Amino acid sequence: MARKTPIDKYRNIGISAHIDAGKTTTTERVLFYTGVNHKIGEVHDGAATMDWMEQEQERGITITSAATTTFWKGMAGNFPEHRINIIDTPGHVDFTIEVERSMRVLDGACMVYCAVGGVQPQSETVWRQANKYQVPRLAFVNKMDRTGANFFKVYDQMKLRLKANPILIQIPIGAEENFKGVVDLVKMKAIYWDEASQGTKFSYEEIPAELKASAEEWREKMVEAAAESSEELMEKYLGGEELTEEEIKAALRQRTIANEIIPMMCGTAFKNKGVQAMLDAVVELLPSPLDVPPVPCELEDGTPTTRKADDAEKFSALAFKIMTDPFVGQLIFFRVYSGVMKSGDTIYNPIKGKKERVGRLLQMHANQREEIKEVYAGDIAAAVGLKDATTGETLCDPDSIVILERMVFPEPVISQAVEPKTKPDQEKMGLALNRLAQEDPSFRVKTDEESGQTIISGMGELHLEILVDRMRREFGVEATVGKPQVAYRETIRKVCEEIEGKFVKQSGGRGQYGHVVLKLEPQEPGKGFEFIDAIKGGVVPREYIPAVEKGIRETLNSGILAGYPVVDIKATLFFGSYHDVDSNENAFKMAGSMAFKDGMRKASPVLLEPMMAVEVETPEDFMGNVMGDLSSRRGILQGMDDIPGGGKIVRAEVPLAEMFGYSTGLRSLTQGRATYTMEFKHYSEAPKNVAEAVMAAKAK
């Protein structure tokens, strides 16, 4: 079966935003206008197509990123048919892992901002993730019909907070309840959408007289940005010649794909205005798989290479999401970077070193599915029947093995003990937790060796709450959850030049002998653990050096202060001795572990605690209370901003340990009128009194 859509007509995009910017509603309109949905699903009534988990429909927030395929021929039916694969990503900070893994497989993104709230903290997080994967972007300012909507303020915030280079390709006609439509700065026409047809019909009209001057001014900036794409256009522009509509669009596309500009538009998805033009911009300005660089990868021996987006190349794909479907079982979502794969083909997973046969291939539309026979370069689809693949792993042709770059997932910052309510729950709970951990790499499960309790860890209270809720709904497991615990870390502050570890056992028969000398140094935050082999002259034989490292790495799991994981240390093995008969791997492993523990004691060990970036939006009357409360929680105030229409945003860095139950406290402080967001920022040394309290609690 031949490819239906040429690859240059593909657009793999994400729709990303802060919670409440109206992203899911925007996606719903996209599905409506592209003809997938005949009735618009509203988030308000829990009927949105992309939000298909029960909890998402109840809470009105998007948790998992559903992938959907749609087709678009242009607002005026003026394009050849384009295939748009959309990944809907969550906007809540507890689910940044979902955003991260979808950014990895996208070619472009639409950033949705609220015209009232503007650039909010999660918008900055998503922006950083898009920068990391160099994803070209459009900005869509939504909710232009809301009180306090201000398109130009969002433009200023994008420059200031995101250090972006937004270029307006539209300006709004009116705002708040008077928002009527937009001025298309390329065509220099006003666009009005017909409300009776839910925005499926529109008209081009003359620009209102009062907006003429503003439109000319913003068009001039846009044309100048377009002219900067090449010397040829710049000469034409400086010579006073008019650039054609085609030249402007081609130049804006070139600069968008190069990540030099962010074309900016506006509308109100809820009132059916603007999303149609945003879809046109996706086709006209965002890249196809052919417009982005070939994907970097490695051969089995580590040699760097690339794979082009071409059906003739050998098959390679990246698994970016695992989901359990109630009807077909485990689904692996993947992005095809090169080649073709048919259902029934055998593929190879180089990370696991295993071959697997692909069962069925499915094209997903939110939670509906269509069975397909094959997938091509550029496709995003789901496979059934792969037992071993997990998120971030490569799937490739067994005869042409490559490894695509691995994804790096954040370490959890919060833990809770979870206990089954009944004996039957006990058996099901292990299975349920393992299944959930397989789907979500930022969720970890372990058993506490001392208490025997099951400990779950994740990115925030809401993250864990939703996973426990899924356990109940999807697996029928009732569980009680303990108090949240902070994921502290331990490190050192001093250099220790010479620490000896000697493990000697001389009893009858064969003894044990391992002797090492280490140097320990603190590393800069976030650098992790590093082991350096500086042995000269074979004083520790080559074959025992990995055992020394293994002994140290095992010790890292439990620090000497309160048993928390140890981070950011460099250990250099530079001397030691061995015994011809009694030395073995185990003896050197023990010696490495002993030396490291001793060195930790001598190198000024400290406890590190996770610090959170907290932003509180509050009416001005309560600002003093909010700031006082944050300070009492050991918060460090970072600044304040005004909210249009009154109110303030207070920004602070606060230890996670002080933020449990904050939503209840904030509600009572502000009569329920303030909201907040919080995300992990970095680890910082805990004050002495806090460290002592944590150590005392652990010692009980």
UniProtKB/Swiss-Prot annotation:
Cite a single GO BP annotation. ribosome disassembly
PROSITE patterns reported in the protein's UniProt record: G_TR_1, G_TR_2
Localization per Swiss-Prot or TrEMBL:
Cytoplasm
Q: Where is the tr-type G domain?
A: 8-290
Key words, A-Z: Cytoplasm, Elongation factor, GTP-binding, Nucleotide-binding, Protein biosynthesis
Q: Where along the chain is GTP bound? A: 17-24, 88-92, 142-145
Give a yes or no for keyword Protein biosynthesis in this entry.
yes
Spell out the molecular function terms from Gene Ontology.
Answer: GTP binding; GTPase activity; guanosine tetraphosphate binding; translation elongation factor activity
Instruction: Name where it mostly resides.
Output: cytoplasm
For this protein, the record's InterPro entries field holds:
EFG_II (IPR041095), EFG_III (IPR009022), EFG_III/V (IPR035647), EFG_IV (IPR047872), EFG_V (IPR035649), EFG_V-like (IPR000640), EFTu-like_2 (IPR004161), G_TR_CS (IPR031157)
* Gene Ontology cellular-component terms listed: cytoplasm
Q: Which residues cross the membrane?
A: none
The record's family statement is:
Belongs to the TRAFAC class translation factor GTPase superfamily. Classic translation factor GTPase family. EF-G/EF-2 subfamily.
Its job = Catalyzes the GTP-dependent ribosomal translocation step during translation elongation. During this step, the ribosome changes from the pre-translocational (PRE) to the post-translocational (POST) state as the newly formed A-site-bound peptidyl-tRNA and P-site-bound deacylated tRNA move to the P and E sites, respectively. Catalyzes the coordinated movement of the two tRNA molecules, the mRNA and conformational changes in the ribosome.
This chain belongs to the protein called Elongation factor G
* Gene that encodes it: fusA
